[in-house]
Amino acid sequence: MKLRQVVLALGIIGLFIVILLNRHQFVTFWHLLINIKLYYLIAVVIVQLFSYYLNALYYRSILRAFKYEIGLMRLFEGAMSSNFVNYIFPTAGMGGAVFLSQVLKPEVPRGQGFLTQIMRYVLSSIAVAMFIPVSILLLAATDHSDATVFEGVIVAAFLILTVGIIIYKLVRNEKLVRRLHNWLSLKFHFLKSIGSKSFADDFYSGFHEIFGNVRTMFVPYVWSVTYIVVEVFTMYLAFLALGRVVNPGIVLMGYIVANISSVFGGAIISVGAFEVSLTGILVALGQPFAFALSVTLIYRVLNMIIGLPPGFIYYRKYIKKTA
């Protein structure tokens, strides 16, 4: 069986497993529709699709820094398909990075395509950290301040920052990374597509170009910040759909905590880490459990309905390019 057929089969199996694991959420979501203001749900769909477009704008901005010009529609497809891969294959985002490099070839070398997605994670993490004091100030202005929650978020953010610094230091050790890269490509034959010497050469070419002129990352960073604002707004629409107006700090803190949790949980399982942490933090910030769970279901189920089917279609489209 060819590699393309194997990867496609894995994608279908993964999609089936995700649907199976989330079947109760879809049933509960269906019952929630009775009490939901549908025009807010329509707004969620539109805004969520717009967030994928923002990802495409991010990709275009960083690729232009590398002197590559790729069409926005293709980048939009890359955003949806790499998100599908990240959801189906829990690899802490690495699967999506590898797949994006597949979408961008042959115009963009695989190593730089991989780096494009990695920098998205880096810039998004910096943006999330920037919003932590904003959420704390918003919550402190009302009766939702909770020292334990704040301390937990700050500690988690510090851990992510520490891990990020360690990874950055390791990546700068080019000799060590090249040895690891060669070992992985020899040990695991399915990594053959990223196992060539040119992959590492292209990756470090882009890496040195970025950190040799950090100012080129300003526009990609702005798109990363804009993306987070839109995602938080999408979550806020879920509150409005259930007829409740809340302090934006609650929504922002919920988004931050859920994303921090998914960073640590994403290497093990793509289903559950975000949902459990979002529901938990909303309850900790004073929202009734039933309401917090309903908001989480609306946000995540719509996210899956909007992202997974077209993501699978684009995943299948670009799998055909697999060598």
For the regions a protein language model found, what residue spans apply to each?
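Helix-coil boundary and interhelical linker segments in multi-pass alpha-helical membrane proteins
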Residues: 141-145, 240-246, 286-291
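Short intracellular "coupling" helices and adjacent cytoplasmic loop segments at the cytosolic face
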Residues: 80-98, 207
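Membrane-embedded alpha-helical segments of transport systems
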Residues: 81, 85, 89, 114-137, ...
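Membrane-interface alpha-helices at helix entry/exit sites of multi-pass transporters
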Residues: 73-77, 91, 95-96, 106-122, ...
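Predominantly cytoplasmic-facing regulatory/coupling regions of multi-pass membrane proteins
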Residues: 1-80, 147-263, 302-323
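Transmembrane helix-loop junction
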Residues: 64-65, 87, 106, 137-140, ...
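Transmembrane alpha-helix interface/packing and boundary motifs in multi-pass membrane proteins
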Residues: 82-90, 255-275
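Re-entrant/interfacial helical elements at transmembrane boundaries that shape
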Residues: 92-106, 266-284
